[in-house]
A protein has these predicted regions:
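Metal-dependent enolase-superfamily TIM-barrel catalytic cores that perform enediolate-based chemistry
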Residues: 1-20
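Short, electropositive alpha-helical surface patch
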Residues: 2-4, 70, 145-146
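Structural beta-strand/beta-sheet cores of well-ordered domains, especially the beta-sheet scaffolds
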Residues: 8, 51-53, 143, 167
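Acidic active-site catalytic centers that drive phospho-/nucleotidyl reactions
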Residues: 15, 35, 87, 144, ...
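Active-site-adjacent C-terminal substructures of enzyme catalytic domains
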Residues: 19-133, 161
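C-terminal cap of metal-dependent C-N hydrolases
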Residues: 122, 142-176
């Protein structure tokens, strides 16, 4: 925890394979996020209440390793924000496909499309410590966004879980 004195908030890899106490340690030390959370009970959910620690669910890892699903719906029902990210890495989650993560959020974790969009944008930006500049379409923030192919409502985004619905992508205010 030496980084705290230099303004660095910890990120805790917690409760992926077993209930480890990592969630409570993260909250105790003011971690910006606790990540994975496949093994969570009510005690862990309660410990997150009132904290500034973002619970971050990694659906790609749970899918690839055939782990239990994090109780994202229970966390939201308890009044907690939830972030969802890909955990893109070659060992446990070899996909950075955020459209798939958004679909999994709705289909497997039972988030509404609005909750899933929030979990994969603003809440994830918070979990990375960059929500002041990224994560939402707000004056003064960096314009990183996607433009989808035409769809009549947000609910169609997670529905097309196997198709690329991105028509254009903007990074730093410029289409790429």
């Amino acid at each position: 925890m030496a980084g705290i004195k230099y303004g660095m908030r910890p990120k805790i890899h917690a409760n992926e394979m077993a209930v480890s106490g990592g969630v409570q340690v993260g909250v105790k030390y003011g971690a910006i996020s606790v990540d994975h959370l496949e093994q969570m009970g009510q005690a862990e959910i309660e410990s997150l209440k009132g904290s500034e620690t973002m619970p971050t669910v990694l659906p790609g890892c749970a899918f690839f390793l055939n782990l239990p699903l994090s109780p994202a719906r229970d966390m939201i029902n308890a009044g907690l924000p939830v972030a969802m990210a890909s955990d893109f890495n070659p060992g446990t989650s070899p996909s950075g496909n955020m459209q798939l993560i958004l679909s999994m959020a709705c289909i497997r974790y039972r988030l509404t499309p609005e909750e899933a969009l929030n979990a994969t944008t603003l809440n994830t930006a918070y979990a990375m410590g960059v929500s002041d500049e990224l994560g939402s379409i707000t004056r003064g923030k960096v314009a990183n966004l996607i433009v989808t192919q035409p769809m009549t409502q947000l609910e169609f985004m997670p529905y097309y879980y196997g198709a690329n619905k991105v028509a254009k992508m903007m990074l730093n205010g410029k289409f790429v």
